[in-house]
């Protein structure tokens, strides 16, 4: 199947082009297009993500260097000019790429789901990361008086270790207001940092027969209804409580659980609120610990978007670039699963970054490459991102 094909072409063969074309037709993406199609555009952006291009100009230089290989890489027959890619990113509907990203996330989640904790039900972490932008160049992304930025809000499947949902807003949008964008599923655990203690939304989770685990703010006002006297090591408090603030009590009128946990490794105390009364206090603490997986995802996302210049300055172009980054991330996760690779994701990404235009079978590439040869490409990623 992959004989005499470039590594990049073998990789993109895992993409569902039929499904992508459905979104292209839905939004008229290829209307009046003669050469550089939406498919070519997405692959060009993915090539830039995987090869760590620093700017649009840097990406075009790479295409010029591989001009003879361009068609077989899936990038079309015509030379790709800087203005061609910039215009496509500015004018083509970002929803084509966003909806394909949702499709890729669903496929990756379904394939990669495992039970990393002995707790039934899906487990998600929800958080955001801010990507700073120059206000003079991106005036639509105003954050503060002299700053600009966008936020990527992500619902992250901590068992499949891929995003399950995301949305992009300006950085001025408060995190807790995005809770209403989540479609809550029954018998599912949602893990939040303390920026998300909107009791109205937490009660909504409770009423859908799902569960939340959220860090409590230090100024929380509550009364203890009942507490446990015997607790395991490092559990300092395990109590049933009710809110006492007038507005808070109206937003969450029932009692819930408060767990105070001491982390020996960091010498810190954490206070969690949850409606999961069926779990042990240690299970609650261990669930919250899995939040670090979404932080690793944000490190990857920021590294691949932390470039000298975005490949377009409009909101549409920025949304396309973020969507393509997530598509690329999910593609690597799917390839890793389907090929049953024993490599860590860190190794897979690094090997791909220096091998995209090689004619080596993917299996041979990952089986035979000595990772010591690519250690000089070291970055802040922690090995085992999907493992």
Feature names for model-found ranges:
Residues 58-68, 75-82:
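A short glycine/small-residue-enriched secondary-structure motif
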Residues 70-73, 358:
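Juxtamembrane membrane-interface segments at transmembrane alpha-helix termini
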Residues 72-94:
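Major-groove recognition helix of helix-turn-helix-like DNA-binding domains
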Residues 73, 112-113, 140-143, 201:
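Catalytic micro-motifs at enzyme active sites that drive phosphoryl/nucleotidyl and oxygen chemistry
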Residues 82-85, 108-111, 369-375:
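Short alpha-helical linear motifs
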Residues 106-113, 176:
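A short, well-structured juxtamembrane/interface segment
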Residues 1-58, 62, 92, 99-103, ...:
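Single, function-defining residue in the core of a domain
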